A protein has these predicted regions:
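A hydrophobic alpha-helical transmembrane-helix feature that marks the membrane cores
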Residues: 1-254
Length: 254
């Protein structure tokens, strides 16, 4: 009996070690996909934004003609540029169960490219130095928040409801401010937005970790590939929102 218990504990220890090793690989994959998505977004936003700024100044463009830029930003096509990433995200969420892992990865990269188009205007409005500074601050804050969410022993699953309510409140306030055009309200939205998405970063990092442990413990490995993509998408969105809200405080306009 004692020998059986020893074998059982040894087997459990091996299983735990395997899960821990798999968890590290899973989180590395999540962060890797997120980073690649951010790189795609950044490159496209920079290329399009710099050409847009050049076209506005009457200078030669490098990649896109002034006519194409005019169509993208000054015609009804601009609504596609603005809302296409949202449509892709909602469609992805609805169809992810039917997609293969490769298809899901392709949709994520498509979303990243479309988001690059959607936010390219920042390179035409803000100085490159202030954009780089804001990105650096965002990256440090994000890493700290995500690391805390991963390592903390505190169960923060209860934050979810309040954070989602915060996101809904931000959306409503932003819609209202379209009509009010209040700088004070925009300041408040940006400040609260940083806090809400900071909380979501820690919350969802812990959720990604716990989801992996639950799936791996029950042998549901076939879903883990797509779970990594969904986790990367969530963290990508939180990073981008923190960056954009901080840019309202730290960005210097051209």
């Amino acid at each position: 009996m004692a020998e059986f218990e020893t074998v059982r504990r040894a087997g459990a220890g091996i299983r735990t070690a395997q899960i821990d090793e798999g968890l590290r690989a899973h989180m590395n994959r999540v962060y890797g996909l997120m980073s690649l998505g951010m790189l795609i977004t950044g490159v496209i936003a920079y290329i399009v934004g710099m050409d847009f700024a050049a076209a506005r100044a009457g200078e030669p463009t490098s990649f896109l003609s002034p006519e194409i830029l005019q169509t993208m930003f000054s015609s009804p096509v601009r609504y596609f540029v603005i809302f296409a990433p949202l449509l892709v995200v909602f469609g992805f969420g609805a169809a992810v169960n039917r997609l293969s892992e490769n298809a899901a990865r392709g949709v994520f990269f498509l979303f990243s490219a479309l988001m690059g188009l959607s936010i390219s205007w920042i390179f035409a409005v803000y100085t490159g130095a202030s954009i780089a500074q804001t990105f650096f601050v965002t990256a440090i804050a994000f890493l700290g928040l995500s690391l805390w969410g991963y390592t903390t022993k505190k169960d923060i699953s209860g934050w979810g409801t309040f954070l989602i309510m915060g996101v809904i409140g931000l959306i409503v306030a932003s819609i209202v401010n379209i009509f009010l055009a209040s700088s004070a309200l925009m300041f408040a939205i940006s400040a609260i937005g940083v806090l809400v998405f900071a909380g979501l970063t820690a919350y969802d990092t812990q959720n990604i970790k716990n989801t992996y442990i639950a799936m791996a413990s029950h042998g549901q490995t076939e879903w883990l590939g797509k779970a990594a993509i969904m986790g990367a998408l969530s963290l990508y969105l939180y990073f981008l929102n923190i960056f954009q809200f901080l840019l309202m405080f730290m960005g210097n306009q051209e």
